[in-house]
Amino acid sequence: GPIDLDKISSVDEISFLKKLFPIYKTIKNVKKNPLVKNKDLIGFVGAPWTLLVYMINKSSPKKKLIKNFFGDNYLIKKILKILEKFLKIHIENQIKNGATIIQIFDSWAGLLDKKDLPNYVYTPTLNLVNHVKSLKIPVICFPREIKDYKSFCEIVKPDAINIDYNIDPKIIAKQIKIPIQGGLDPKVLLSDKYTLKKKALNYLDIFKNHPYVFNLGHGVLPETNPMM
């Protein structure tokens, strides 16, 4: 349905924080656990663009629906700025409660054409990255399926980049100088252990001369065997 800009603009910080309080409480409790002593704890936020996509379409987003929304460029930019404001508060509160790294997920960056990336992905994410850096905290970005990770890193300047499984890791290893995370296709976890080991070792070999955090290129699929 239509998005009520006045309703979004009138949301006060107290109401916003009340809904997120369980997250901050969980972060604080995790930090108290002796097992995480001297270890980093990653706080997570969705990027403004991805949050907007879910506001337009709550289920799995359809590119056609998003395209229909592009007609009102003013509305999009206005909502992104409002989301950016509240995300900065959310980031600050995660850090206050113990997060030592922030990761920004832009799960639907890949929906956009190249010409739309500067306004809807690069600029809003850069503003968040600069805010996190001003708090002296490292920041990881995950612009899923953006294809041009090199340009993203040059413009947004995260401390590390999370890659998806649709990009060739060999190209990334040549193009990107900052630490890299992820890349493994979650579907590999649905295969046998031999295939999983082979794929994992391939990533480790490709990034053997590069700062690399082994991880999936997106979330664990619901049907994945936890014992895999």
Regions found by a protein language model. Give the residues of each.
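Active-site-proximal, glycine-rich beta->alpha crossover segments in alpha/beta enzymes
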Residues: 1-93
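Alpha-helix-loop-beta-strand connector modules within alpha/beta enzyme cores
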Residues: 8-39, 114-139, 174-178
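General structural feature for long, well-ordered alpha-helical segments within catalytic domains
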Residues: 19-22, 26, 30, 79, ...
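Flexible, active-site-adjacent loop/turn segments at secondary-structure boundaries
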Residues: 47-50, 67, 106-110, 115, ...
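Alpha/beta enzyme core
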Residues: 57-104, 114-138, 150-159, 204-208
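Catalytic-face loop-and-helix region of soluble metabolic enzyme cores
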Residues: 130-228
